[in-house]
Amino acid sequence: MSSQTVNPPGYPTRRLAGRSRSALEIPVLDREPGPLGRRIASLPGEGHPVWTYVLGIIIAFVTVASLSLVTGIVVTRVLLHVQGVAGADESPVRFLARHRSGGLTDASLVGSIMAGGVVLPIVAVVAAVIALVAKHWRLAGFLLFALAVESASYRTTTLLVHRHRPEVHRLEKLPVDASYPSGHTAASIAVYCGVALLLTSRIQNRGAQIAIWAVAILIPVYVAFSRMYRGMHHPLDVAGGVIVGVAAVSALVLVTRASGSAAR
């Protein structure tokens, strides 16, 4: 008689369920939050984890917008009044404007479109829908709200911090006093670097991680140069965009971990 292992009742179900949970795990979002994240998780008391998430999003927006506003005030009211800073911030844009060509102008348009108000929302929504189909609502929220927090913080800053765009021929007709910060740069970081963070959190292959991050970093760099080439932003505006984008991604990681902790 041949021996045959008989699994206990329910064994296959548990195994498949384990695989399903593993397939949904995003380590960077599923880690236990630090002290600040635990504090956010405890704020709604015994309420539903969704309330933790909603409250966290509000805190994230207020924090990122405040950081952007303070940085913008320092740039426009302090740094630019230091002798030589304003000229140094304008000169790279003038250099790029003097060396424009048909091919470079077309390339700058592509860079702007990649981080524009049409492409990035589509990328974020499609990725979020995929996450929802996989029944990972916190991942979907991260993908959507990283861009939403970035965009709201950027818009708030441009309304309250007024800086004129570079004094060169500008290739786009946008409000002239909304130079700081670069929303395209911030949005490209929020989406492309946010997705890279999620992917490299799951992928164990070191070479693949390096390749993903290389692309995710090069895209915002390309976008930043495109915006300066087109006469829309100064280098300090781009730096402000980097701050907003990185802050938005960091805040959403914290909020997502906090909501996960509340759910557990």
Q: Which positions does each model-derived feature cover?
A:
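Membrane-embedded catalytic cores of phosphoryl/pyrophosphoryl-handling enzymes
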Residues: 170-264
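C-terminal ends of transmembrane alpha-helices
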Residues: 72-74, 155-165, 222-230
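Membrane-interface loops
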Residues: 80, 86-87, 122-125, 130-214
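Terminal transmembrane helix and immediately flanking juxtamembrane interfaces
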Residues: 1-139, 235, 239-264
